[in-house]
Each structure stands twice: as C-alpha cells, then as structure tokens.
UniProtKB/Swiss-Prot annotation:
This is Large ribosomal subunit protein uL2. The gene is rplB. It comes from Corynebacterium aurimucosum (strain ATCC 700975 / DSM 44827 / CIP 107346 / CN-1) (Corynebacterium nigricans). Residues 258-267 have a biased composition (Polar residues). Disulfide bonds: none annotated. Residues 1-53, 224-278 are annotated as: Disordered.
Length: 278
C-alpha cells in the first residue's frame, strides 16, 4: 500500500496524506452483503452519552464479514475482488464459493484477485486459508483468531495485525499477540494464515480536524479548560494545573482500568511490555 503526500497548498493539505488504494479492485460493494448502519452519536436508548467523542460522520453501510468460515469447510472459494471497507482499517476480500455463495473476509497481506482459498482442517498452509490451531505448524504467522471455539474471530483483525503461533501444550496453543503479550488459546479455535493487509494505514496523517469529523470522531476537550460543573479539573482563576491527580470526568483515577482479577488472567503466560500507564 502506497501513501500519497500532498503539497502544502493549504494548511489542511500541508500535513495530509492518503492511501493510493492500489490493492482495491472494485469500488462498488456486493449488495447482498450490505446492511443498514444507524448512527447513535454515542448515546444509549435513554439518550444519554455512554461513549464520548462520537458523532456525525459520513453515512455508511455495514459489510457482513464471515469471521467463522466453519460451514464452508472443504469448499474452495475464488477471490473475486479486494474492496475498501469504511467500517474497519483493513481491506476486505469478496469470495465466490464453488457452491455459488458469496462472502466477505478480512483481506490478508499478499492475497490477490483470482487466488483460490479454502477453510477446514485439511486446508493447505497458505495465505487466506482458515484452519484450527491444532492443524497449523508452529511458527506460522496468523490473524483473525478465535478466543472460544466456534465463536468467530476476535483477535488480530485490524490493518497490519498478526499473531505468531509459538507452540502447543496439551489442549492449548501458545500465541504471541501484537502487543507482545503471550497467552494460551484453546487449540480447537480457528485462525487464518497470514497477516492482515493494508499495514501502511497507520502511517496516514489526517492533516485536519475535518477529516476526523468525516470519520465520526468529535473533539476531545481537556478537563482543565472546562468549568467545575463539567470536570473535577475545571475552574480556577487563569490557567491552572487542575490541582489534583489526574482523574476522569467522573472522578476515577487515571490509568489502567483492567480488572486485576479478571477470569482470563490464567490464560496469560507473559504480560505485554510494562511501559504503559498504571
């Protein structure tokens, strides 16, 4: 994926860059795999904001992605097109199965139009094929990994993400996550061979606030510039430091929020690199 940098003709263009979309082979999505996608503005059914910084954005339609592929074991599929998906950072691939059905999957790096892919325990170890972890050789790079057998892919689905299969111990596979965390996953879970494509997406510079608004992202305002009614750091005469340790708008201490006694902790072999905020 190449990135086009603009000449500084305006302040917004000065810092902007966009994808060349060279991998994309079709601009019109498959109509039968589209669903309406309504906007919430970050509100729940009571109309209260439950997620901040969400609102507006370009109208989208959701593309149905097959994250399981279990019911297509042994049925070969041809990659008809590589398409853009506005709902995720990765591109998607449209598969035409031999039985006539069409489905979308996450497009891995190197998957080309016309390639034949397959799912199932007996599938070859090649990019785009989906197999149980017990059938994948140690050291293989994989993506779209399940956390529970049959639940659908949950791990490594965004652009450029990949997981390495380090080994197998009894009924568990040992995986190195994109965060460098090493964890166990049930060996019956399925994964797709290869890494997710469109890795250069992380290098795109949005350049101006308006492009983020097109994506449905609203501004993030610092608490120290708010009024006392809006944030614990708000108020004061002139510019202040907030006057207390950093907290959320609801007064909770800033830092990690993961439950230290989470039920899945026993599946983590080694934590990710400890350079995060505590």
């Amino acid at each position: 994926m190449a990135i086009r940098k603009y000449k500084p003709t305006t302040p917004g263009r000065r810092a902007s860059s966009v994808s060349e979309f060279e991998e994309i082979t079709r601009s019109t999505p498959e109509k039968s795999l589209l669903r309406p996608l309504s906007k919430t503005g970050g509100r729940n059914n009571y109309g209260r904001i439950t997620t901040r910084h969400i609102g507006g954005g370009h109208k989208r339609r959701y593309r149905l992605i097959d994250f399981r592929r279990t019911d297509k074991d042994g049925i070969p599929a041809k990659v008809a097109h590589i398409e853009y998906d506005p709902n995720r950072t990765a591109n998607i691939a449209l598969l035409h199965y031999a039985d006539g059905e069409k489905r979308y999957i996450i497009a891995p790096k190197g998957l080309k139009q016309g390639t034949i892919v397959e799912a199932g325990p007996n599938a070859d170890i090649k990019v785009g094929n989906n197999l149980p972890l017990r059938n994948i050789p140690t050291g293989t790079t994989i993506h779209a990994v399940e956390l529970k057998p049959g639940a659908g892919a949950k791990l490594a689905r965004s652009a450029g993400a990949s997981i390495q299969l380090l080994g197998k111990e009894g009924k568990y596979a040992i995986l190195r996550m994109p965060s460098s965390e090493i964890r166990r996953v049930d060996i019956r879970c399925r994964a797709t061979v290869g890494e997710v494509g469109n890795a250069d997406q992380m290098n795109i510079r949005w350049g101006k606030a308006g492009r983020m608004r097109w994506k449905g992202v609203r501004p993030t305002v610092r608490g120290v510039v708010m009024n006392p009614v809006d944030h614990p750091h708000g108020g004061g005469e002139g510019k202040t430091s907030g006057g207390r340790h950093p907290v959320s708008p609801w007064g909770h201490k800033e830092g990690r929020t993961r439950n230290p006694n989470r039920y899945s902790n026993n599946m983590i072999v080694r934590r990710r690199r400890p350079n995060k905020k505590r």
